């Protein structure tokens, strides 16, 4: 975590949005869980929402890499951005991690499916609003999938919504 903190200039900042990408298998989810646990140990409330894995899969990964997940980390397996927004409020989250943005959808934009450019941009926009426009500032990490050209899958404009774009290069 100290290396991550160094790369982002001293650690995550509340009211900031960070996009984290890598090729498949590059360690995005593992790094995000590690960040979650480290933040929770500092007393922060963390919401980790996965649209790709079940809660038991997330817990299994956390047990494998961390031995145990801190009680201040709330794990959520759901691809509804509406539910993520509600959970962020209910858990009084200081840090929200969404893994990965291309798997989430807002009900307002259905029947457009998760991964559709409109859904991806609108979901990211909601996360920016959580970070910067809520009652309290929140740090947000958006995990993004890369395409075969090693670019962030979806719209390039997604990168412009973030304060920091990080690419894990294998």
Question: What positions do the PLM features span?
Answer:
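Short, solvent-exposed loop/turn segments at secondary-structure junctions
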Residues: 104-108, 112, 146-153
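The Walker A/P-loop phosphate-binding site
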Residues: 1-69, 85, 89
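Structural recognition of the conserved hydrophobic beta-strand(s) that form the central parallel beta-sheet
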Residues: 48-50, 75, 96-98, 137-145
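Amphipathic alpha-helical transducer elements in NTP-driven molecular machines
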Residues: 1, 5, 14, 29, ...
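Short, ordered loop/turn segments at secondary-structure junctions
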Residues: 23-25, 51-54, 79-81, 100-103, ...
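Flexible beta-alpha connector loops of hexameric P-loop NTPases
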Residues: 21-24, 69-78, 105-121
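Proline-aspartate-enriched helix->loop->beta-strand connector
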Residues: 88-98
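Phosphate-binding/switch region of NTP-binding enzymes
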Residues: 121, 125-170
């Amino acid at each position: 975590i100290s290396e991550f903190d160094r790369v982002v200039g001293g650690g995550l900042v509340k009211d900031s949005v960070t996009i984290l990408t890598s090729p498949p298998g590059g360690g995005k989810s593992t790094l995000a869980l590690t960040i979650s646990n480290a933040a929770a140990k500092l007393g922060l409330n963390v919401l980790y929402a996965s649209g790709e894995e079940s809660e038991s899969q997330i817990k299994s990964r956390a047990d494998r890499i961390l031995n145990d997940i801190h009680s201040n980390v709330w794990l959520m397996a759901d691809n509804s951005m509406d539910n993520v927004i509600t959970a962020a409020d209910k858990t009084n989250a200081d840090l929200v991690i969404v893994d990965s943005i291309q798997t989430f959808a807002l009900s307002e934009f259905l029947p457009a499916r998760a991964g559709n450019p409109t859904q991806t941009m609108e979901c990211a926009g909601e996360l920016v609003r959580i970070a910067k426009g809520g009652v309290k500032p929140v740090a947000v990490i958006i995990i993004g999938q890369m395409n075969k050209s090693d670019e962030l899958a979806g719209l390039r404009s997604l990168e412009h919504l973030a304060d920091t774009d990080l690419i894990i290069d294998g």
